[in-house]
Design a protein with these regions (language model features):
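Short, surface-exposed tryptophan/glycine-enriched loops
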Residues: 126, 165-175, 186
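A generic beta-sheet turn/junction motif
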Residues: 1, 12, 141-143, 171-173
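Aromatic-lined ligand-binding clefts that engage carbohydrates, nucleic acids, or primary amines
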Residues: 9, 125-151, 158-159, 178-182
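Carbohydrate-binding surfaces of carbohydrate-active enzymes
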Residues: 1-118, 126-133, 167
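An acidic-aromatic loop/edge-strand motif
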Residues: 62-117, 173-231
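Aromatic-rich membrane-interfacial microdomains
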Residues: 155-165
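Extended, loop-rich substrate-binding clefts of extracytoplasmic carbohydrate-active enzymes
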Residues: 121
Length: 231
C-alpha cells in the first residue's frame, strides 16, 4: 500500500482551490496549480483509501508554486514490547506484555482471542532531539477505533484510514508516554460465547434467569436476541 499522486483537472477557472480533509477537519489553500482559463489542474497526494473535498472560492491570491504536499520521512518506528491492559470483567487477562503488536483473534489466550471491548496500550519512548516540522503517528491497521493520548494530552480518535494523527504539540525531547485505547467489534465475544452452553432464547421463550434478574448459569459474557452469525 503506497501513496498515490494524481493530477486532477476541474472545470473551473479564476478561483482559489482549497483542500478540505473530511477526517481531520483540516482546511488549507492549495498553492500549486495551473489555470488555462477553462480548467484548473493540480496535483493531489492520497494515502490508501483517502479522500478530500476540493473547494474553489475567492481570488487566486495564494498561488505560490510551493508543493501542495510536504515530503514525508520516517522519524522512528515504535517497535518492541507494549504493555496492554484488558478488562477482566469482560474476560480479558488484565495487564499483559505484548512482545510485538498482533491480531487479538490469533492469540493463544482465549481471554484475548475472544475479547470484545477496549484495551489500553502503553509505551514509553525517547526522542533524542527536537524535530522540525509536523509529526504524525501512524497506527498501521487498526481494528476498529483508537483514542491516542501522548504525555497526558488527548489527541483525539482515529477511526479510518490512513490511521494517523498529529502529535507535534504533545511530543517532547526525552521520554514520552504514549497511551492508545483500542476498541474492537462485538463479534469476537459472540464467537467466544458460542463455545459455551447456550442459556439464551430458545424458540420464543426468554431465559428464566433473565426474567427473574438472576445470575446467568453459564459463563457467557453477552446476550443477544438474534443469532445473526454462524460460529
Amino acid at each position: 500500500e503506497k501513496d498515490v499522486e494524481a493530477e486532477c483537472s476541474f472545470r473551473v477557472s479564476g478561483k482559489q482551490p482549497q483542500l478540505w480533509n473530511p477526517v481531520t477537519g483540516e482546511t488549507r489553500y492549495l498553492t500549486s496549480f495551473t489555470d488555462n482559463g477553462t480548467v484548473t489542474t493540480l496535483k493531489l497526494l492520497f494515502d490508501t483509501t483517502q479522500s478530500y473535498f476540493i473547494v474553489f472560492a475567492g481570488k487566486t491570491d495564494h498561488r505560490t508554486g510551493e508543493p501542495n504536499f510536504s515530503d514525508k520521512a520516517d522519524l522512528m518506528t515504535l517497535g518492541g514490547s507494549w504493555n496492554v491492559s484488558f478488562n477482566p470483567l469482560w474476560g480479558g487477562p488484565d495487564s499483559v506484555e505484548f512482545k510485538e503488536l498482533s491480531d487479538w483473534s490469533l492469540s493463544e489466550v482465549e481471554g484475548i482471542r475472544y475479547y470484545s471491548g477496549t484495551a489500553v496500550y502503553n509505551k514509553l519512548f525517547d526522542l533524542s532531539e527536537p524535530v522540525n516540522g509536523r509529526v504524525y503517528l501512524n497506527l498501521g491497521n487498526v481494528k476498529n477505533i483508537a483514542k491516542v493520548t501522548l504525555n497526558g494530552h488527548d489527541l483525539g480518535t482515529v477511526w479510518s484510514a490512513p490511521w494517523e494523527i498529529e502529535i507535534t504539540d504533545a511530543l517532547t525531547s526525552g521520554e514520552n508516554k504514549l497511551r492508545i485505547e483500542v476498541a474492537n467489534l462485538w463479534v469476537n465475544r459472540l464467537i467466544g460465547d458460542e463455545q459455551l452452553p447456550d442459556d439464551g432464547i430458545v424458540g420464543e421463550q426468554w431465559p428464566q434467569w433473565l426474567i427473574n434478574g438472576e445470575k446467568r448459569p453459564s459463563s457467557r459474557y453477552t446476550f443477544t436476541t438474534y443469532k445473526h452469525y454462524s460460529a
